Amino acid sequence: ILDQGEPKYLNSPETPLFSKGNTLYGLFEARQAIRAKEYVLVCEGYMDVVALAQLGFPNAVATLGTACTANHVRMLLRQTDKVVFSFDGDSAGQRAAQRALEACLPLMSDDKEIRFLFLPTEHDPDSYVRAYGAAAFEKAIQEAMSISSFFFKVASEGHDLTTPEGRAHTHHAAKPLLLSMPPIALRTQMLRELAIRTNTTPAELEAFCGLTIVPAPQVTYQTKVLKPQSGANAQTV
């Protein structure tokens, strides 16, 4: 906020020529670096992108004052198989991360990796790198929370999993997220892990969510006894 009480940055409105939901700041310039580093770092603000490019992270992009959309995710996954979202650790950052999770889950596939990095509340990416160094920031990126771990965090937030009510509330929160996903192996694994965490069987949880888990194929062997023909002995197959 400036001295006059005005915001430092003003978000421009959507127009037919400028759609924030279809635009990522710095993506064109970052394409080569994204391929070289094999991941893209998505920041909350375009000034983070400018600063990070100067500090050794030219593979950073940013949304333009709007929540992450499905179109943003499609654009990112066309460039790389690994996406890392960086958010502030405050409540606003948590809300933005949850919206990104909701945008990502319907577009997940088993060959893609999406992670969520939450910085301390007193830092943004620029200040974190300046305080702890580029190596520490890179380490934090590589150790960022997986999309499945963040899913469990969102679904169980504020719920006591030691109580039936808490487990039921967690199932209620998880259901629309699981239903939004395509029928991939990751969804099956997430559902089974959620069943373990909530003391539920996978069959009970999939019935609640209206999902079908394909069971592993079982191979059976049968023994057939052939009737002996004239002059022949019984044969067993």
Task: Describe each model-derived feature in a short phrase.
Residues 31-40, 67-83, 87-237:
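A charged alpha-helical hairpin associated with nucleic-acid processing machineries
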Residues 1-79, 96-97:
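Phosphate-handling DNA/RNA-contact segment within nucleic-acid enzymes
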